[in-house]
């Protein structure tokens, strides 16, 4: 075999390996979505069976998210040394163990632990696939990250349809659906050779990666992690502040850099972005249940429908990115999402499907395009900056977003029921509870079952109004994002337009 033939064979092998890695990563994201969508389908069954309040259900959504951020940050710090393949073995173990624990759960804490473990696996998957794909496609990162993240809505569609078609079967069988994509990505990725991350290839030192994120970036991540873990384990505020201070001061002493201000700004924007997309996704089934039931359609189909829109559009993201630029695409998406959420909160009947379509278009490009902007602007940050933006987004939903939506509903139900029927209010409200947002009194599910059908209808009407209020509140967030992206667009326009930063090989210098 001559040299040219040998080179062609070698390239073919590389292309084949890249295909297996990319689509294996895609299926791994499908697995993360399966766990999420099934939770939205069975959360109301959990509420009835285990007498959960709306805020407790919100906390279960939250614990499906914040440990994700914990694992994605920790693996980002060590994954280049540990190895991407070993990290995926850990993710596989988490997905398998979490399903078993959840299926065997006997109450709130069993569900909580099972959901916590699946979130660790999900974070590990993202810690691996984002830098791997950014490295494989260095000249078109935003496009390929969008295609990769079509796996998320794709998993929502497939997992959601399977769960809905299973009908009223035991929720444990629906939870077991995650075994399907987990087995597939395990077979596709185990034993594969992962590429060396572009920062490492270019010889950019580990400390420089930490300096790109900087003190300000780590301050946000640490504050969100410590506040949520402190809430879960009932740590006093003094302990939370002390632990957070030790972590941030230790990081400061080592890196001695504030970090990139644009990265800090993008971290702040990621908080409303993630709450708009994931926070609303978490509740979309329950939020739209009253209206969809009047049409004779299970509300879970709304999330499946909007996810189908996302999946299709992400596969064809290239023209949108090239026409509008990543920041332009994010600005337009923010406006469309805001209009869609307002429409969802006001629409009734068939019009709700049109509103859901608008919302689906709006949220489609948020997450992967934000990752693309970070990958293109901060390549020296390697796996850390790329995954820290995802961590902050996920933490903000786990700590703030999902629990906040539940709190809005519980507080609205409390206030409206007290005004409409004070006697009923005293009969069916549970003891006062405390969340991160303050005190509230949830409905007692056991007492609710004992009242008359007429009284139950009163409660259902109030609950429906509370769900609409939650959607209207979320609509404020993409408006905030639109302002932020407009500022960045003007900044780049003053510098000649948006351009991806080029990573020079540090090993060839001086």
Predicted feature locations:
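Helix-breaking motifs and short loop linkers at transmembrane-helix boundaries and internal kinks
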Residues: 51, 83, 104-109, 138, ...
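Conserved MFS/SLC helix-loop-helix module at the cytosolic interface between two early adjacent transmembrane helices
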Residues: 70-109
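Central cavity-lining transmembrane alpha-helices of secondary-active solute carriers
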Residues: 59-77, 304-317
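Extracytoplasmic
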Residues: 17-54, 126, 130, 280-288, ...
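Helix-loop-helix hairpin linking two adjacent transmembrane segments in secondary transporters
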Residues: 147-244
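Glycine-rich segments within core transmembrane alpha-helices of 12-TM secondary carriers
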Residues: 140-163, 386-409
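Low-complexity, proline/glycine-enriched hydrophobic segments characteristic of transmembrane helices
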Residues: 404-475, 510
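Extracytoplasmic gate region of multi-pass secondary transporters
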Residues: 39-41, 214-242, 251-304, 398-408
């Amino acid at each position: 075999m001559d040299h040219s033939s040998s080179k062609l064979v070698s390239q073919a092998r590389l292309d084949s390996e890249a295909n297996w890695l990319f689509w294996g990563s895609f299926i791994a994201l499908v697995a993360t979505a399966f766990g999420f969508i099934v939770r939205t389908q069975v959360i109301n069954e959990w509420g009835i069976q285990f007498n959960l309040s709306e805020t407790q259900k919100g906390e279960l959504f939250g614990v499906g998210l914040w440990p994700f951020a914990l694992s994605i940050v920790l693996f980002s710090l060590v994954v280049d040394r540990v190895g991407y393949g070993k990290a995926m073995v850990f993710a596989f173990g988490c997905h398998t163990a979490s399903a078993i624990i959840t299926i065997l759960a006997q109450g709130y804490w069993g569900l909580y632990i099972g959901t916590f473990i699946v979130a660790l696996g999900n974070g590990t998957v993202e810690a691996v696939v984002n830098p791997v794909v950014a490295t494989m496609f260095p000249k078109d990162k935003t496009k390929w990250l969008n295609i990769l993240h079509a796996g998320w809505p794709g998993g929502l569609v497939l997992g959601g349809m399977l769960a809905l078609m299973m009908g009223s079967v035991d929720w444990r069988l629906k939870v077991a659906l995650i075994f399907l994509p987990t087995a597939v990505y395990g077979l596709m990725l185990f034993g594969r050779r992962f590429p060396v991350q572009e920062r490492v290839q270019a010889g950019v030192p580990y400390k420089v990666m930490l300096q790109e994120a900087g003190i300000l970036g780590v301050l946000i991540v640490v504050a969100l992690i410590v506040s949520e873990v402190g809430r879960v384990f009932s740590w006093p505020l003094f302990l939370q502040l002390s632990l957070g201070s030790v972590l941030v001061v230790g990081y400061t002493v080592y890196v001695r850099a504030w970090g990139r201000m644009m990265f800090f700004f993008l971290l702040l924007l990621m908080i409303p972005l993630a709450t708009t997309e994931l926070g609303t996704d978490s509740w979309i089934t329950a939020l739209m249940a009253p209206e969809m039931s009047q049409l004779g359609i299970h509300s879970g189909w709304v999330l499946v429908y909007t996810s189908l829109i996302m999946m299709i559009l992400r596969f064809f993201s290239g023209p949108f990115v090239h026409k509008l630029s990543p920041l332009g695409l994010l600005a337009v998406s923010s406006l469309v999402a805001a209009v869609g959420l307002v429409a969802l909160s006001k629409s009734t009947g068939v019009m709700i499907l049109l509103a859901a379509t608008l919302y689906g278009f709006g949220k489609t490009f948020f997450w992967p395009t934000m990752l693309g902007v970070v990958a293109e602007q901060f390549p020296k940050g390697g796996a850390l900056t790329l995954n820290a933006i995802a961590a902050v987004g996920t933490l903000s939903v786990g700590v703030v977003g999902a629990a906040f939506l539940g709190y809005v509903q519980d507080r609205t139900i409390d206030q409206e029921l007290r005004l409409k029927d004070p006697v009923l209010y005293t009969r069916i409200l549970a003891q006062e509870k405390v969340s991160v947002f303050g005190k509230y009194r949830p409905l007692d599910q056991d007492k609710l079952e004992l009242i008359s059908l007429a009284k139950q209808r009163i409660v259902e009407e109030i609950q429906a109004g509370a769900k609409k209020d939650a959607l209207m509140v979320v609509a404020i967030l993409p408006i905030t994002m639109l302002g932020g992206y407009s500022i960045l667009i003007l900044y780049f326009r003053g510098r000649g337009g948006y351009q991806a930063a080029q990573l020079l090989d540090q090993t060839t210098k001086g």
